[in-house]
């Protein structure tokens, strides 16, 4: 079984998450099989992005060691997505206090995108 190393856990709960919250969420982590980790963290199939024809809004974290910003920018460019770079947060965006900021940006984007 595999557990994420401490630096990956720290990256998940970095930024504005309090030490107490980070510890609480860390205590909920459970060991995974190496196969499950591989499937969850590697792109196992290729997608021809030339055929993606839908509006997309991508949220990325500037200092995310799990999903490098360079790759996120490349995806956004390839599919013509709007990209929002988040500061002072870790990979676990839904667990961070910035989540309210993220959700506040979705509705205006949807309205602007669907009325074009």
Language model region names:
Residues 23-26, 73, 103:
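Generic structural signal for individual residues within well-ordered alpha-helical segments
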Residues 65-74:
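Conserved alpha/beta-hydrolase "acid-adjacent" motif
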Residues 78-79:
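Short, structured coil segments at secondary-structure junctions
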Residues 33, 64-65:
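Glycine-rich nucleotide phosphate-binding loop and flanking beta-alpha elements
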Residues 1-54:
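Alpha/beta-hydrolase
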Residues 52, 58-60, 64:
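Short beta-strand/loop motif that positions the catalytic acidic residue
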Residues 82-116:
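Catalytic active-site module of serine/aspartate enzymes centered on a nucleophile-bearing elbow/loop
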